[in-house]
């Protein structure tokens, strides 16, 4: 079909619908006019756009913060566009220096491979993986010869690299910057050249890297991609970006009760943002909810319960969501112990340090984590709070151990 042919009224309506839906939650589109032009071209020709999301496979656990861009990809996919999920197995050996204050450790090939597989499995909870192209950038980056690398490096100046806030801070404070770190945005940009990307999606912290794709596509004679950025969502502390290392996250692979319980601790002022960015709840419903919260006709607790139910339903199904909601009401609103506390057969010493007990029961992943939880008042034995890290527990039959608000264990000596 002629790409210059005017759109029919039906096609124009579809373009308007796509642009409006795909702009939901977006912070910036560069350039905005090209975004609409690409959608128009796709509708006119019937050819789907190539939509790219690059992943640095250094931390494989997907949390709600990651799903902001994944929900956007899902929208593109529902409109028939082609999703290119790029696993940076080659760039992952460097690690994305964005926001880092020091040089990152290099991952082994095996670590990158394992992390990438975990990513794909978890992303499949949001995307239709059968309709998603999975690419590894080692396919083309490992084929570059040294003269190709020199050509690539010649597209960027050191001064331009130092405009990046993270590099600038490290340079000014005397922190080392390895030359290979400068290649990360160059390689990410070259990925867009190799993949012939039409639109690249990423968080606002990826703006520099995404713009690099446009610059390199032009340098290599390709049509320039559109950059589309989405917000970084604050974690459960309400201040810092959601991150597993900061322990302010909701992991999509966590148990349903854990997801629901964590959702109930989302700060009131962030609820609407979570709804808009991390769910597919229609905007008119979100606007009505926002209005209700503002005029007091909707209680924040009820809005959080709906959000928690939605998160669990998205990643574990409706039945699990219903059960998690009931569990929360029983344990936290009625202050009762759950009926289905896991039972552990205890065959160890009858006198055991509390820290060792928590780790042995897999209620904490390390002694350091257990120590911090005890000091923070998050551990109870038979509903009695324990804050002394040196406590030695006398193990009894049917003794209840509680960590935080949602982890329980019952010990059996028989």
Swiss-Prot record:
Residues 352-413 form the S4 RNA-binding domain. Its EC number is 6.1.1.1. Pfam families: SYY_C-terminal (PF22421), tRNA-synt_1b (PF00579). ATP binds at residue 244. Keywords: Aminoacyl-tRNA synthetase, ATP-binding, Cytoplasm, Ligase, Nucleotide-binding, Protein biosynthesis, RNA-binding. A motif ('KMSKS' region) lies at residues 241-245. GO terms for molecular function: ATP binding; RNA binding; tyrosine-tRNA ligase activity. A motif ('HIGH' region) lies at residues 57-66. Its main location: cytoplasm. It catalyses: tRNA(Tyr) + L-tyrosine + ATP = L-tyrosyl-tRNA(Tyr) + AMP + diphosphate + H(+). One of its GO terms (biological process) is tyrosyl-tRNA aminoacylation. It is found in: Cytoplasm. GO terms for cellular component: cytosol. CDD domains: S4, TyrRS_core. InterPro entries: aa-tRNA-synth_I_CS, aa-tRNA-synth_Ic, Rossmann-like_a/b/a_fold, S4_RNA-bd, S4_RNA-bd_sf, SYY-like_C, Tyr-tRNA-ligase, Tyr-tRNA-ligase_bac-type. Belongs to the class-I aminoacyl-tRNA synthetase family. TyrS type 2 subfamily. Catalyzes the attachment of tyrosine to tRNA(Tyr) in a two-step reaction: tyrosine is first activated by ATP to form Tyr-AMP and then transferred to the acceptor end of tRNA(Tyr). Homodimer. This is Tyrosine--tRNA ligase. It comes from Shouchella clausii (strain KSM-K16). The gene is tyrS.
